């Protein structure tokens, strides 16, 4: 059991957070009237991305998948201010990566002077993916990160999402990455258009996502198994909606009991669980997980100009 709580309480007893969608067992019918909070703090979006990408890249480090002949291809990377932290984190670990950042929007200026970072100012289509594949040396392994989103900059329609997922499938098929982190939010059942396919992967739940976000990251490693696609139908969409609404209304707003940390809110508990196992250079040693996570949180919040 992950947690034990009563409906009326605003506290949880948990030994670990829900990290992946398949761990969610509770369901809650969607209720638009409950979606009354859109409060976000400055830098929250970049924090969400940074924590998810730290987890993803650390998984590859521990699996000995990530090494110095690797190119990180990040499509939809702007503004990307969090990438500066990732870059210096990898540099501290002496992992000499190459980065290709691609977006038609403007990137944070702090990225322009970084060594081995190429910034390409354009949006991606199938034709450009073939060109990109030919640009990258054949002996370089590709790790793909995608954060593509609607050109309108608003909540995407189901048609927008289907277009994005078809494009992400092309990214995986053409670039042939050894691993990928893809943006993933199932279209809502009441806006359903048609069934579609996505790559198999672990559906990573994002700490510090907006309060009622149903977005996840689809994490896949292809070095041990070929790419497989799974079909998503309307029944799956109903399950996604109910379980993500349960997570966002019954779990994330609460505090975690017996969690010895300055902030006991669920998203901080989740962040703690990710950061406590992050690989660090050998010269950075801590006597407790709490010391380690406080150190990392301060570094991350300072990098993103977040006021705790």
UniProtKB/Swiss-Prot annotation:
Gene3D superfamilies, sorted: Vaccinia Virus protein VP39
Alphabetical list of SUPFAM superfamilies matching this protein: S-adenosyl-L-methionine-dependent methyltransferases
| Primary localization | virion
Amino-acid positions noted as binding S-adenosyl-L-methionine in the UniProt annotation, renumbered to this chain: 46, 74, 76, 80, 103, 105, 124, 147
Active site, renumbered: 183
Record localization: Virion
Instruction: Please give the superkingdom of this protein's source.
Output: Viruses
Q: Which GO terms describe its biological process?
A: 7-methylguanosine mRNA capping; methylation; regulation of mRNA 3'-end processing
The entry's mRNA-binding residues are 30, 185-188, 190, 213-215, 241
What would be one Gene Ontology cellular-component term for the protein?
virion component
Q: Which UniProt keywords apply?
A: Elongation factor, Methyltransferase, mRNA capping, mRNA processing, Protein biosynthesis, S-adenosyl-L-methionine, Transcription, Transferase, Virion
| Pfam families assigned | PARP_regulatory
Q: What reaction does this enzyme carry out catalytically? A: a 5'-end (N(7)-methyl 5'-triphosphoguanosine)-ribonucleoside in mRNA + S-adenosyl-L-methionine = a 5'-end (N(7)-methyl 5'-triphosphoguanosine)-(2'-O-methyl-ribonucleoside) in mRNA + S-adenosyl-L-homocysteine + H(+)
Documented EC number(s):
2.1.1.57
- Which GO molecular function, any one, fits this protein according to its record? mRNA (nucleoside-2'-O-)-methyltransferase activity
Q: Where is this region: Binding to NPH-I?
A: 177-257
Question: What PROSITE patterns does its record include?
Answer: SAM_MT_2O_PK (PS51612)
Q: What does this protein do?
A: Displays methyltransferase, positive regulation of the poly(A) polymerase and transcription elongation activities. Involved in the modification of both mRNA ends and in intermediate and late gene positive transcription elongation. At the mRNAs 5' end, methylates the ribose 2' OH group of the first transcribed nucleotide, thereby producing a 2'-O-methylpurine cap. At the 3' end, functions as a processivity factor which stimulates the activity of the viral poly(A) polymerase OPG063 that creates mRNA's poly(A) tail.
Family, per entry: Belongs to the class I-like SAM-binding methyltransferase superfamily. Poxvirus/kinetoplastid 2'-O-MTase family.
Q: How does it assemble?
A: Interacts with poly(A) polymerase catalytic subunit OPG063. Interacts with OPG109 and OPG123; these interactions might help linking transcription to capping and polyadenylation.
Q: What is this protein called?
A: Cap-specific mRNA (nucleoside-2'-O-)-methyltransferase
């Amino acid at each position: 059991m992950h947690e034990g709580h009563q409906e009326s309480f605003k506290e949880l007893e948990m030994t670990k957070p829900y990290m992946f969608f398949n761990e969610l067992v509770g369901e809650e019918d969607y209720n638009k009237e409950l979606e009354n909070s859109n409060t976000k703090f400055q830098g929250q979006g970049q924090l969400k991305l940074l924590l998810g990408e730290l987890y993803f890249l650390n998984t590859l480090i521990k699996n000995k998948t990530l090494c110095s002949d690797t190119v990180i291809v990040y499509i939809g990377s702007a503004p990307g201010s969090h990438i500066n932290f990732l870059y210096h984190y990898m540099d501290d670990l002496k992992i000499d990566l190459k980065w290709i950042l691609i977006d038609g929007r403007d990137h944070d200026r702090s990225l322009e002077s970084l060594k081995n970072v190429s910034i390409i100012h354009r949006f991606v289509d199938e034709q450009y993916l073939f060109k990109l594949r030919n640009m990258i040396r054949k002996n370089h392994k590709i790790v793909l990160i995608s954060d593509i989103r609607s050109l309108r900059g608003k909540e995407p329609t189901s048609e927008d999402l289907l277009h994005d997922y078809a494009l992400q499938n092309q990214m995986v098929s053409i670039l042939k990455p050894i691993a990928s982190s893809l943006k993933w939010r199932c279209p809502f059942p009441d806006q359903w258009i048609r069934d579609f396919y996505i790559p198999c992967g672990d559906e990573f739940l994002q700490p510090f996502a907006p309060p009622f976000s149903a977005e996840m990251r689809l994490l896949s490693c292809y070095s041990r198994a070929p790419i497989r696609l799974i079909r998503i139908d309307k029944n799956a969409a109903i399950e996604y909606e109910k379980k993500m609404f349960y997570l966002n209304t019954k779990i994330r707003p609460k505090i975690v009991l017996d969690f010895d940390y300055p902030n006991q809110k669920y998203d901080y508990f989740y962040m703690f669980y990710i950061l406590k196992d992050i690989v660090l250079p050998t010269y950075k040693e801590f006597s407790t997980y709490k010391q380690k996570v406080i150190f990392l949180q301060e570094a991350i919040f300072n990098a993103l100009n977040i006021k705790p």
